[in-house]
Design a protein with these regions (language model features):
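Short, low-complexity, polar/charged sequence segments that are solvent-exposed and flexible
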Residues: 14-18, 49-51, 60-63, 98-101
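Extracellular structured ligand-interaction cores
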Residues: 25-27, 76
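Compact nucleic-acid interaction/catalytic patches
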Residues: 23-24, 34-72
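Short N-terminal edge-element motif at the start of the domain
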Residues: 1-25
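C-terminal terminal-subdomain/extension
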Residues: 63-165
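Short beta-strand-centered aromatic/proline hotspots
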Residues: 28-32
Length: 165
């Protein structure tokens, strides 16, 4: 979580895990893609009522299960650079000792993972196109760039972290 806070210090578009706004327990869960030979984590978000009226765009995708029920979204605009040192696997297996809430969360994560696996090529393509727009031609689509993380700036934070170890 320290890495996420380091990123958030240099870019307000990074999804917060700050204790000041009661987000310290929010997991940063996402799908890892490779853009420009760099690993990026595209954050997943749980379904919210506002997502029903939102349309898929260059920086946003809704995920639906086989019954066409909204199961979550991918926020490409909030993707962050990662390396193996900041990635942790998630135990998505349902255990008897899991609470009802944990079981529901793991079921949701499994549904989201199924959707992501079924749409992996489109996810990677969308992430890389967005990366290229924001990192290489930010003036081309200013409104889009404004709501996205500054990928190049965040890459410097990751590089600094790597060099300090």
């Amino acid at each position: 979580m320290k890495y996420i806070r380091d990123l958030a210090r240099v870019d307000d578009n990074v999804m917060s895990v700050s204790p000041q706004i009661r987000k310290e327990n929010r997991p940063f869960v996402g799908i890892v893609v490779i853009c420009d030979n760099k690993k990026y984590c595209v954050p997943l978000t749980s379904p919210k009522p506002k997502h029903m009226s939102m349309k898929n765009d260059k920086d946003f995708s809704r995920m639906f299960d086989k019954d066409n029920k909204l199961i979550g979204c991918l926020n490409f605009n909030n993707m962050i650079p990662v390396d193996d040192s900041v990635l942790l696997p998630i135990d998505m297996e349902v255990h008897k000792s899991d609470s009802i809430g944990e079981q529901a969360y793991k079921a949701l994560l499994n549904d989201q993972l199924d959707w992501c696996n079924d749409n992996l090529e489109a996810i990677t393509s969308k992430a890389c196109k967005l990366y290229k727009i924001v990192a290489e031609t930010p003036d081309k689509m200013k409104n889009l760039t404004r709501r996205c993380c500054d990928f190049k700036n965040l890459e410097q934070v990751l590089e600094k972290r790597k060099n300090s170890k």
